[in-house]
């Protein structure tokens, strides 16, 4: 799902930041 993918990216970016 696109939503799930976006959520995963957000979490990844948040962890990276």
From Swiss-Prot:
Q: How is the cofactor bound?
A: Binds 1 Ca(2+) ion.
Lipid metabolism: is it a keyword of this entry?
yes
**Record keywords: Metal-binding included?**
yes
**Keywords of the record:** Calcium, Hydrolase, Lipid degradation, Lipid metabolism, Metal-binding, Secreted
Q: Which GO terms describe its biological process?
A: lipid catabolic process
Top-level taxon of origin: Eukaryota
Q: Outline what the protein does.
A: PLA2 catalyzes the calcium-dependent hydrolysis of the 2-acyl groups in 3-sn-phosphoglycerides.
User: What is this protein called in UniProt?
Assistant: Phospholipase A2 1
Q: Which organism is it from?
A: Daboia russelii
């Amino acid at each position: 799902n696109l939503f799930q993918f976006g959520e995963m990216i957000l979490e990844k970016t948040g962890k990276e930041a």
